[in-house]
């Protein structure tokens, strides 16, 4: 068992050390607002040291037998299982996740590591024919090199591991910069896990800092070949452009504005349960959350009535209480921004069915009906327990409303006719959409990613293996060939 006091340092070159900056990052419980640990921030020099350590350790990792690599990754899963209760506590303490959310996140983490553990023995190549006599074309799948990972605050343990584990499994070195609000769950906890599993010193490095301290050095550094970023579309756009400027491949998992669509033949009670889960899991702080609930006009009032009743039953408050479903937002800035969004929506004509209170970082559920596509709340990502209800009269209208957003991450459609649901889903401009399910889905072997402004690239399974590797063509001329001169 470990304590969080052990995890408040940088992890660079296989060593736990203080950041070089005199400036301190306070790690606060978002519910109590109490500081439970502090970090000395990493500087650009620390980032440089971390990247160089990763590049050096990657060469040692190259020499490790693929089956030994698999065993090391499997040991990481074992360590998580042995310390699961402590990790649950950390998730509740650091990011205000409920016990239910923490257990859900840990399950996702274990699954993605198990998938990544198969990567070392899936580094397959090809032998291809040649137009030239006596020539053999070999195609090798090789690690990209070093990967820089920048993770968010909402599911920090999983969304860090979603890039870290596959990158390691594919043979790369990694430098991880967790969000400054969640430096342990998104960063040093992961370092502890892989240190215990036995990866080479320096293969994984964690730098805890903020942009004010390091500027663009994390992305601009010459060592990393890939920058994997999960976060807002605004920041992701900047990071993607900066990475491309320096000829690095950006992997971007960005914002969403998912529509949960209920056709007139849906199982209403089942759809209500799925819709509530799609919106209020982890206080709505999920990129796949159903910001918009689109309901056919013939069942709109009935659905809204049942939805409100279900939401009223959700306990709001202390995430340490096992009965709590809706805990705190990560910080007061998120609360203030959400409050302004709700106020603006009401000014624009949205009708509050349930207007929740705002108290510090605790936000009670808010349900707005008769929201129109032109309203700002219908166009933006909502990172909190606020939901917009919209009415439609036909499938074509529902498709138009669902697609009237710059985002294209996830979605859901409910109907008693499954093939009708699939045909409808194909018309929605998202990377993922689910028939008779929630908008929140992530499986370790299925392609995950968005369209439009929701990101670039796909993660999980074979897609992560492709993203974190490159192909090298080596030709072998077995027989002497003739040349024109």
Curated annotation (Swiss-Prot):
The active site is at residues 253, 287. It comes from the Bacteria. Disulfide bonds: none annotated. NAD(+) binds at residues 231-236. Optimum temperature is 37-40 degrees Celsius. Keywords: NAD, Oxidoreductase. Optimum pH is 7.0. It is an enzyme of class 1 (oxidoreductase). It catalyses: benzaldehyde + NAD(+) + H2O = benzoate + NADH + 2 H(+); vanillin + NAD(+) + H2O = vanillate + NADH + 2 H(+). Induction: Transcriptionally regulated by SigD; part of the yfmT/yfmS operon. The keyword rRNA processing does not apply. SUPFAM superfamilies: ALDH-like. Its EC number is 1.2.1.28, 1.2.1.67. Disruption phenotype: Loss of conversion of vanillin to vanillic acid. It holds the Pfam family Aldedh. GO terms for molecular function: benzaldehyde dehydrogenase (NAD+) activity; vanillin dehydrogenase activity. A benzaldehyde dehydrogenase able to act on substrates with 3- and 4-hydroxy and methoxy substitutions; converts vanillin (4-hydroxy-3-methoxybenzaldehyde) to vanillic acid in vitro. The physiological substrate is unknown. This is Benzaldehyde dehydrogenase YfmT.
């Amino acid at each position: 068992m470990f304590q969080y006091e052990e995890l408040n340092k940088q992890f660079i070159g296989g060593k736990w050390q203080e950041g070089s900056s005199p400036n301190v990052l306070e790690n606060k419980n978002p519910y109590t607002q109490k500081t439970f640990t502090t970090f000395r921030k990493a500087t650009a020099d620390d980032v440089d040291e971390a990247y160089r350590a990763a590049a050096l350790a990657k060469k040692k990792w190259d020499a490790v037998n693929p089956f030994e690599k698999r065993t090391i990754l499997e040991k990481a899963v074992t360590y998580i299982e042995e310390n699961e209760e402590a990790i649950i506590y950390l998730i509740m303490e650091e990011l205000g996740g409920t016990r239910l959310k923490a257990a859900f996140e840990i399950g996702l983490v274990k699954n993605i590591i198990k998938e990544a553990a198969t990567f070392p023995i899936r580094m397959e190549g090809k032998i291809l024919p040649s137009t030239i006599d006596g020539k053999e074309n070999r195609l090798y799948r090789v690690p990209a090199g070093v990967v820089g990972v920048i993770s968010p605050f909402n599911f920090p343990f999983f969304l860090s591991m979603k890039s870290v584990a596959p990158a390691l499994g594919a043979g790369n070195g990694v430098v991880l910069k967790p969000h400054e609000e969640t430096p342990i769950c998104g960063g040093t906890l992961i370092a502890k896990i892989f240190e215990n599993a036995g990866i080479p010193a320096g293969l994984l490095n964690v730098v805890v800092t903020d942009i004010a301290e390091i500027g663009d050095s994390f992305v601009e550094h010459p060592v990393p070949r890939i920058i994997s970023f999960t976060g807002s579309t605004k920041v992701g756009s900047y990071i993607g452009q900066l990475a491309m400027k320096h000829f690095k491949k950006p992997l971007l998992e960005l914002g969403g504005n998912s529509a949960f669509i209920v056709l007139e033949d849906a199982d209403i009670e089942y759809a209500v349960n799925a819709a509530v889960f799609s919106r209020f899991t982890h206080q709505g702080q999920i990129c796949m959350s159903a910001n918009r609930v689109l309901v056919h006009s013939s069942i709109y009032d009935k659905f809204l009535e049942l939805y409100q009743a279900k939401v009223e039953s959700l306990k709001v408050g202390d995430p340490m209480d096992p009965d709590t479903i809706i805990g705190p937002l990560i910080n007061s800035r998120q609360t203030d921004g959400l409050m302004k969004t709700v106020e603006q929506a009401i000014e624009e004509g949205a009708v509050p069915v349930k207007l929740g209170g705002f108290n510090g970082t605790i936000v009670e559920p808010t349900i707005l009906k008769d929201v129109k596509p032109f309203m700002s709340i219908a166009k933006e990502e909502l990172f909190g327990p606020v939901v917009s209800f919209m009415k439609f009269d036909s499938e074509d209208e529902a498709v138009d409303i669902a697609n009237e957003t710059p985002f294209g991450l996830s979605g859901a459609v409910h109907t008693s006719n499954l093939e009708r649901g699939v045909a409808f889903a194909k018309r929605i401009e998202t990377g993922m959409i689910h028939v008779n399910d929630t908008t929140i889905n992530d499986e370790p072997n299925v392609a995950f990613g968005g369209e439009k402004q929701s990101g670039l690239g796909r993660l999980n399974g074979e897609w992560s293996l492709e993203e974190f590797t490159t192909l090298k063509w080596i030709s072998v001329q077995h027989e002497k060939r003739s040349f024109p001169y």
